Amino acid sequence: MPEQGCGPPSRVLLHSLRSPTVMSPSSPSPSPSRKPKPVPERFQVAKTTLWFDRIMTKTIIGGGFTVIVAVFGILFFLLAVTIPLFQGAEVKEGQSLAPAAQAAGTWGLDPSGTQPFVYSNGKDIFFLDKASGNLKPVPVALPDNETVCAHSYNSFLSAYPIATESGKVGVISVHSGLNIHGQVNAHGPTKAGTETSPLHPMTENGDVPGRISGVAYADAGERKIFSTINETDQGPRLLLMTLEESRSLLHEGEFIPSGFHDLTDRLDGKPVAMLPGNSGDSLIVATDTDKLLYFAYNENSETWEKRQTIPSPLGDGERMTTVNWLFGDMSLVLGGDRGSLKIFSLYPHPQADGAALRLFGETKKFPPLNGPVQHYAASGINRSFLVSSPHAVRLCYGTTADIRWESDRLDFSPVQLAANAEFNSMLATDGQGRIHFFSIKDRHPEAGSKALVGKIWYEGYDSPKWLWQSVGGTDDYESKLSLMPLVFGTLKGTLYALVFAVPVAVMAAVYTAHFMPPSVKRVVKPVMEIMASLPSVVLGFFGALYLAPRMEDKVPALVCMVILIPSLAALIAWFWTTRPAAWRNKFSNGLEYIVMTPVILLCAWFCWEYLGYWLEQPFISLTRGIMSLWGAGDFQAASFADLWRNGFGMPYEQRNSLVVGFVMGFAVIPVIFTISEDALSNVPPSLIAASEALGASRWQIVRTVVLPVASAGIFSALMIGLGRAVGETMIVLMATGNTPIMDWNIFNGMRTLSANIATELPEAAQDSTHYRVLFLGGLILFSMTFILNTLAEIVRQRLRKRFNVCLLYTSPSPRDRT
């Protein structure tokens, strides 16, 4: 035991080393040339440490490579899903055969595209066996005393409208017994056959004038339309008959004639073609004077009105050779004898009385074919269609006016074209009676660069627009898949969020890092970091259910806050600088928040409760007076929302971009604040001390020294905050109307790419066009964040290099440090 008072062992050891060594006489004297040898083991690292170090090194390297592989894996997956959207159509010629018997008539294909059939005014429909080339007759149920004199083919309904010599009309529906996949029906007919509707005369008294030379048919569900061209001694007559379903509680309703109409007197020439619409309220007639007539059914008067006459729709004296409906019966495809190909669609036309009337107008124009347009076949699932000239066939898509495929030159001249409803098979007949079969592979005609980013003139709209309306309530809905409204909404929401978040977060970080007392900073910074963990769904609910209703009528109060609070803070700061130094030194640095917090809260409460309301009505009156002087007219407004709607003519929604800016700002502020504060706190103290030694004030130090040095970190914080705002989903989904519109109006909503994916992806069919376009939106988000982060890293490295050089020149040398 050491003696008391000798001090700690280290001090005793130091004393013993400094005192002379006392040697006993018997001990040998050490050799002056012998030195103690170092022990090699003291410099060796334990094997377990080396083993653990190697494992951790490989683990970290492997983790880094895994992250890189994962990122590129996501990229490759998104590319694999979206690349098919930009691929064109593929049409391949299959077998070509000549039926064993002459097959004159009108050809059709069943929905599966595997069973061709033909009809030619007889009492049999012939189904073609593609393996043997034989025609199998299937009888048509017609009365023995009726003879068919005219027919046509409706590919959308897979039916033949027929007319008999006695002036009666009906429909022969054809079914092959196969489903769309070419398999035997599990439900419904399992064998090829026909169904014939009851025959009805085209006049009320049954006395039909002349012989029917043309017949057309449309089915609108509860209403069916027949139109015929009757050859009489006075010339062709155009007759129209409507059938409506009779309702009964005991049995299914039967279709009975409900109206007979003779439209001959309202024609400008002789009718040569007619197209009743499957909507049941429209009829298109082409005349020999090259005019296109549009008749519409008036529900009130129960009459057919001629609404429009289009003279020479192809222009330059070119005559129409084909007039056909596009799928949906909202657009007409017109072909001419010089190869012109145009689309006319229904859309509102302003009238003299201020009303708008839906009329046809030219919306699309295709490059001309190399000969007259002769034949036409339309898809039954989208706006694709086929047209042919004497030696070429072209596949087009009506919505985007794209040519999906075109044959270079056929070795035969098509006499007929037919396609199945699924539009994956086509047949063409030639002058020698041979039938040529083609397979069509065009899975995503609705997509493509023009549809996704270009302005498209959609049906029902009076001009080309960027629109996103991916799904509709009917099978013939025209999908609108422009991504521009979604990209615009993403940028709009991000902009309004950053306008609110960046000044608050950066200024708060500056104050916390260099002005706030350390004791308070130890509380504030963890609270802000905890705030970053708030679920976005909670913030979204807060914005939608609490903040949006309260902000709807408080916009003037918010404007007053934005102006008054910074002004009042600057005024108090100026007043503080005018006080004597002896008086200011009584308060510790960083305690300004004790004075400013109550003032800011009191100012915000005063603006919210009183000032906004006091200024709202005078502002409305002043605006009304100014707009009256400008001749903008008078309007009524009881609030700012009414002024915005009625006075400025812009929409004002409760859930709008202003709400998104505030709520998303709360999600972005903690991210920007935390990273910025770390960058500001890590500025070398030597720079700050040198600035203080030169007599700079705290604000001068922050403005001229701290902010430039920390600019790289602050810029990184802004970019990370930008990425957080770009990818936000739930806040935008809940706090806005989620409407895909392109409008910078701050009181309007928007839809972002991320919110659109979250909303629509669960309902999208796998591998459909809609499904792939949603993944394309994800690829755009991925690219946006990747590009932004890459640019941010480049800028950050340059800023860091620049100010590291400055630090190198201003830092003391090692000799100065000693």
Kindly give the residue locations of the regions a language model identified.
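Amphipathic cytosolic juxtamembrane alpha-helices at the membrane-cytosol interface
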Residues: 517-525, 593-600, 689-716
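Interhelical loop and adjacent transmembrane-helix boundary motif
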Residues: 639, 643-650, 732-782
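Transmembrane-helix boundary motif in ABC transporter permease subunits
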Residues: 497-528, 572-578, 792-801
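Loop-to-helix entry region at the N-terminal start of transmembrane alpha-helices
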Residues: 480-494, 548-567, 586-671
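Short loop/turn segments immediately following beta-strands, especially the blade-tip
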Residues: 174-184, 242-251, 296-302, 345-354, ...
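C-terminal transmembrane helix and the adjacent membrane-cytosol boundary/short C-terminal tail
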Residues: 571-582, 677, 681, 685, ...
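Transmembrane alpha-helices
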Residues: 673-675, 697-734
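Conserved small/polar residues in nucleotide/adenosyl-binding loops
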Residues: 809-818
